[in-house]
Amino acid sequence: MIALIAAVSAGGVAGTLLRFATANWVAAHWPRHFYAGTLAVNLVGCLLIGLLYGLFLHKPLAPIELRAGLIVGFLGGLTTFSSFSLDTVRLMESGQVPLALGYTSISVVGGLLATWAGLSLTRF
C-alpha cells in the first residue's frame, strides 16, 4: 500500500508541476489568453487518459502502482476542472461571452474527442 501511495503522490507532483509550468508559460507569452494553458493541459490529459486506459486494457498485468501513478496521480495533477470553470466565469464576467461559450464547447467536445483518439490509438 505504501508503494501505491508513493506512486500516486509522485505522479501527482509531476502532473501538478507540469500544469503550473504550462500556466506560467501561457501567462508570460499570451496574457490575454490565460485560459489557453488550462485548455492545453485538459486536452492533452484527455488524450493521455484514453491512450493509457487502452494500453492498460491490453496489459492488465501492469502493476497497479504504474496504472494509478499515471492515471490518478499524474493526470489527476495535470488536468483541472476547477480552473476550467474559473476561466469560463472570468471570460463571461469580462463580457467575452462568445469566447466563453466557445472555450466551454472546445473543452468538452475536444476532451471527449481527445479521449476517444487516445483510446483508438491502442486498437491498431
UniProtKB/Swiss-Prot annotation:
GO molecular function annotation: fluoride channel activity; metal ion binding
Ways its activity is controlled: Na(+) is not transported, but it plays an essential structural role and its presence is essential for fluoride channel function.
Principal location listed in the UniProt entry: membrane
UniProt-listed InterPro entries: FluC (IPR003691)
Ranges annotated as spanning the membrane: 1-21, 37-57, 69-89, 99-119
Keywords: Cell inner membrane, Cell membrane, Ion channel, Ion transport, Membrane, Metal-binding, Sodium, Transmembrane, Transmembrane helix, Transport
Catalytic activity of the protein: fluoride(in) = fluoride(out)
Binding site for Na(+): 76, 79
Protein function: Fluoride-specific ion channel. Important for reducing fluoride concentration in the cell, thus reducing its toxicity.
Keyword Cell membrane: yes
Membrane topology annotation: Multi-pass membrane protein
GO biological process, any: cellular detoxification of fluoride
Family matches, as HAMAP family: FluC
Gene expressing this chain: fluC
UniProt protein name: Fluoride-specific ion channel FluC
Family that this chain belongs to: Belongs to the fluoride channel Fluc/FEX (TC 1.A.43) family.
One GO term describing the cellular component: plasma membrane
NCBIfam families in the record: crcB, PRK14234.1
Compartment(s): Cell inner membrane
